[in-house]
Amino acid sequence: MARRKLRVRQHTPVREVECPATAHDGDEVRFRTHLATGGVVESRNLVAAVGGYAKPRVPALASDVDPVVAQLHSRDYRNPESLPDGAVLVVGAGISGQQIADELAERGRRVFLSVGRHRTYPRHYRGRTIHEWMYVFSLYDDFVTPDPRHLGEDRRRLPGLPVTAVKDGAGELNLGTLAEKGVTLVGSTRAARGHVLELADNVEEIARDAARSLREVLDTIDTGLRRRGFVAPEQHPAPTVRTDHITDFGPTLDLARHHIGTIIWCTGFGPDYAILPGRALDEHGVPIQQKGILGSIPGLYYAGLPDGNSLAPAAISANVENGRFIARQIHIDHIMRSGSSASLMV
């Protein structure tokens, strides 16, 4: 950004984007962006790079947990020393959940990890990062599309990020390595009754599914390399998730009995489009758009907008083409309005 001399305002949240219904396509100013600091930025075009991971998600059952137990979202977690004494329950086995559970265990805390369905990918494989392989072999699109019959909340649900957790940027981190460190794996949290949580008895099943997802992505990469004649160093041993020492926990977890004083909700984030003009959103509060890029209002573009069946919007590396498309559209708008003879082909 410094090289291109972009005017960047750091630590400046946007309070609201205003686009009056009377705004005309020919207006020089179509958007007024109100900043939390009190300033206003006027523009003809607007790129809303709000993404889909803006607002912490905490399940409703959290309100049914005994109030003596401290609760926080992973966004607010800082370090083990900042937590009350006692054992800790981490809910959610995504990247944050596994890394937090690992750090707590390393610091000598008794840790329980309530698992959920996820895919486990290695951070690196055969000389490349997993994100490079996902880009080369189009793995960003290999995710399930929400059932279109269930709108509303399902439309806001993002495709799950594969777990590529590592410890200190080096060793792989997964359910197998956590269990080996003494982290107690418990089933998915389903309900709460005071100090007792109701669980799905599914630890072994989820661990097997995670191990299978790892084998499948490695096989996809290996097969793709062979078919396309690409050269990449072999990796031995290949990454794996050990499940032989993982067992089901049972249908309930008594927080008091296990001296659990803190629950950390590593249950992800959801989108928050409240700053955008109301007429840019549908009845569910979701942007009206085309292909996750073109907004319903002329001059409004989106970057990183979740499209429901792909991880591409969640990865900066996969948004390069979207960024180029948006830049071309704004360039064309500028050239055609200025009467310049500059080329439109950029």
Where are the regions a protein language model picked out?
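Flavin (primarily FAD) cofactor-binding/catalytic cores of flavoenzymes
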Residues: 1-346
